[in-house]
Amino acid sequence: MSEKYPGPLVVEGKLSDAERMKRESNFLRGTIAEDLHDGLTGGFNGDNFLLIRFHGMYQQDDRDIRAERAAQKLEPRHAMMLRCRLPGGIMTPQQWLAIDKFAEENTIYGSIRLTNRQTFQYHGLLKKNVKPAHQMLHSVGLDALATANDMNRNVLCTSNPVESQLHAEAYEWAKKLSEHLLPRTRAYAEIWLDQEKVATTDEEPILGATYLPRKFKTTVVVPPQNDVDLHANDMNFVAIAENGKLVGFNLLVGGGLSIEHGNKKTYARTATEFGYIPLEHTLAVAEAVVTTQRDWGNRTDRKNAKTKYTLERVGPDVFKAEVERRAGVTFEPVRPYEFTGRGDRIGWVKGIDDKWHLTLFIENGRILDFPDKPLKTGLKEIARIHKGDFRLTANQNLIVAGVPEGDKAKIEQIARAHGLMAGVTPQRENSMACVSFPTCPLAMAEAERFLPQFIDKVDGIMAKHGLAEEHIVLRVTGCPNGCGRAMLAELGLVGKAPGRYNLHLGGNRIGTRIPRMYRENITESEILDNIDELVGRWAQEREPGEGFGDFTVRAGIIRPVLDPARDFWE
C-alpha cells in the first residue's frame, strides 16, 4: 500500500450476484440446453440470460417496437446478437460466403455488422436459429466462444497488409494468445455442437471456476499504427522489430474506456507501460496478467471490476511485480516505439510481397444491400473469385488482402459496381459509431443511425473553414460503456438521452490521450454550433500539422486529462 494507492490486494465484502451465477453455472452450462426447447418465450430465462454471453451472445429486442408490443400485451421481440471469435480479424472467402448466406437466410435484419474489435456480429438471431448459427460457424472452422462477458475477448491485431512478414508474425501471436486464454470448459461443445459429455471434471487453470471479475481485452499492436486503440484494452503487446523481424513486445496494462454517467468512481484510463519482454515469455506473461487480475480484481462491484481499477487500487508497481513473480521474468526497460496514426489506408496498397491489398471503407461496418449501394452482394461477388483473404479492421472496414496483379482489375470493377469504392471525405473515413438503437439494450441515444447525416453536416463545417481535406477523429457512442471508443477520439459524443450527448474534446490523433467533457447533455444543433466555432478557430490558429485535439489543448479550450483516476471528472 502507498499514499496514492491505498487499496488492499483483494476487495472483501458481499460478492456481486454475477459471481453466484458463475459459481452455480456448472462451468457455464446453466440450463441453456433445456432453455432452447422452451417455445413459450423468444428469450432465455433466469441465469441463462447472462450465461449465453460466455457463448458469444447477448439477448436483445427491437426497441423501435417495444412500446407497441407492450401495448398489445406481447413480450418484447427477443432476438440474440451473436459475435464471432476471429483473432486478428482474418478470414477466408469461403468463410465469408458461409456467414453471408446464414445472415441472409436466418437473421431478422439480414446484415453482417463489422465491429471495431475486428470481428462480425449477427443481429436479430431468433432463438430457434441460435444453435444452427453456432453449428454453421463450427463447420467453417469458426466459433463464438468467449467473445462476451468475463473472459479474454476477441484478440485484436494491427491490420498492416504492407509489412507482410511482420504482420504475419504478429497475427500468429494474436492467435496464440486467443487460444491460450480460452476457457477450457466443454460447455460450448456440448450445448452447441452436440459433442459427448465426458465423465471428467472441468477445470479452468487460467480463468478459474468463476472466470474473471469482468470483461478483459487484449491487443497485439504493430507500430506506427495504433488502429487497434491499445489504450482501450486491458493487456497490450506492442511489437518490437529488428530488421523487419519480430523480437519481442512492450507490455502495457490497464487501459479501458467504460464509465457510468455521474459515477465518479468510474473513469476512462490509458494503459500503463510495464516493460519489454522477449518473445519466449509472451504466453507466460499474458497468463500472469490474467491470473493476477483474476485473483485481485474487484468481485463485489462490477462497476469497479476491470483491470484499470485493480491497477489504481493496488498501484501499477505492485501489480507489475506480481506479474513478474508469477511469470518468472523481469521486465526490461520499454523499447522505443511511436505511433503516427490509427486510420485505415482506404484504397489499393502494394505489399512488400508484391501482392495488392484493397481497403474498403464500410460506413459503421454495416454490410447490407442498401438501395443505392448493394455492399453485401458486392462482397459476395468478390469472395467468389478472391484467392487471398478478407481482413476485418479495428476501424470497422474490410481489406481484400493478397490480390495478385492479374485479379486486381476484376476485383476493382466488382467493388466499384456495388458502391464499395465510392469516394468519401477524410472526415467520414475517420468517424465511427457503435450500434446503439434499435438493438442495443443499453443505448441512451442514437449512434449508428445518427452518424451518416451528422457527418454530412460536419463535412459542411469543414468545407466552410477551408478544411475539406482535413479530418478530426470523431466517434459517437450511444451510452457511456464506450463501444464506439469515443473516449479516445479527438471529438467524442457520448449518448445521455434521446437526441442528447456529452461532448468530449482533447484526445489526439494517435489515440494516446483521453478527451475531457466539454459540454454536457446537449442537442445535435448545439453540438454543431460548438464544432463550427472550434473548427473555425482551428483553421485560423493552428500550427503546421497540428491536429484538432492537440489544438484544443494548446489553445486552452480544454485541459488535458493527465491522471484519469484523479482528474477525469474535474
Swiss-Prot record:
Cofactor binding: number and manner: Binds 1 siroheme per subunit.
One Gene Ontology molecular-function label: heme binding
Keywords: 4Fe-4S, Amino-acid biosynthesis, Cysteine biosynthesis, Heme, Iron, Iron-sulfur, Metal-binding, NADP, Oxidoreductase
Entry annotated with the keyword Secreted: no
EC supergroup of this enzyme: oxidoreductase
Pathway: Sulfur metabolism; hydrogen sulfide biosynthesis; hydrogen sulfide from sulfite (NADPH route): step 1/1
Catalytic activity: hydrogen sulfide + 3 NADP(+) + 3 H2O = sulfite + 3 NADPH + 4 H(+)
Described function: Component of the sulfite reductase complex that catalyzes the 6-electron reduction of sulfite to sulfide. This is one of several activities required for the biosynthesis of L-cysteine from sulfate.
Subunit structure: Alpha(8)-beta(8). The alpha component is a flavoprotein, the beta component is a hemoprotein.
Protein name: Sulfite reductase [NADPH] hemoprotein beta-component
